[in-house]
Regions:
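Divalent metal-dependent phosphate-bond-processing catalytic cores, especially two-metal-ion Mg2+/Mn2+ enzymes
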Residues: 2-16, 41-77, 87, 139-191
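Eukaryote-biased recognition of C-terminal alpha-helical segments
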Residues: 23-24
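Alpha-helix N-cap and loop-to-helix initiation/capping positions
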Residues: 99-103
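Amphipathic alpha-helical interaction segments
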Residues: 64-67, 92-97, 118, 141
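His-Asp-centered metal-binding catalytic motifs of divalent-metal-dependent phosphohydrolases/nucleases
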Residues: 53, 76-96, 107, 130-138
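Hydrophobic/aromatic-lined pockets within catalytic cores
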Residues: 91, 95, 112-120, 161
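Active-site flanking loop/helix segments enriched in acidic
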Residues: 27-56, 90-96
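Histidine- and acidic-residue-rich, metal-dependent catalytic cores
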Residues: 53-57, 104-144
Length: 191
């Protein structure tokens, strides 16, 4: 998932990123594994949703125009987007999340703690990129922050099931409905 950026990308990275490509692949994969353990086991929000969003964001980046990909999202940023996708709903139903204005801010705090405690060496610019991407998944209209390419891409990846084939869409819609409205018994009507 993370082995996308060329070696020269790390060589051109800011001096504070002093590790090798292999280091980042291992570090990001480890971080994504730890993120998956922070996901609840709800009908919609669960580790499978994390994996779906990670895959969808990679597919969306591939859809960018050929001349737009390097300018809008670099290969390094594509890997950062996959990492943001891994953390975007981490801790979704933790009681501690209630102390934050949004569950996305809690997910960002969890991600930053993971990066720090595992000594994953990223620049402040990279951390800000991850932060903006995750904030792009905020659903409350008054709090939405989708004014950057990374925020827009992660938001659309988070909602990708809505544009999938009918079976995938319906499965996602039912899971989301069951999670959001557990008090309403029964399945959605057949269409």
């Amino acid at each position: 998932m993370f082995d996308k950026f060329p070696n020269s990308q790390v060589d051109r990275a800011p001096e504070s990123i002093s590790q090798s490509k292999e280091y980042y692949v291992r570090a990001f994969e480890g971080s994504a594994d730890r993120a998956s353990k922070r996901y609840p086991k709800l009908p919609y929000h669960h580790p499978g949703h994390m994996e779906d969003v990670m895959q969808a964001v990679g597919e969306l980046v591939k859809l960018l125009p050929g001349d737009g990909y390097p300018r809008v999202i670099t290969p390094w940023q594509k890997d950062l987007l996959a990492l943001a996708a891994a953390w975007h709903d981490a801790g979704f139903d933790d009681k501690a999340a209630r102390a934050y204005p949004t569950k996305e801010e809690y997910a960002i705090a969890l991600m930053k703690e993971d990066l720090k405690s595992n000594e994953i060496d990223l620049t402040s610019s990279d951390i800000a990129f991850l932060d903006r991407a995750i904030r792009g998944t905020i659903m409350v209209p008054a709090l939405q922050q989708r004014d950057t390419p990374e925020a827009k891409l992660l938001h659309h990846a988070d909602m990708a099931y809505m544009t999938a084939d009918w079976e995938t869409f319906w499965r996602g819609a039912e899971a989301f409905h069951d999670e959001e409205h557990p008090d309403i018994l029964g399945e959605l009507p057949e269409v």
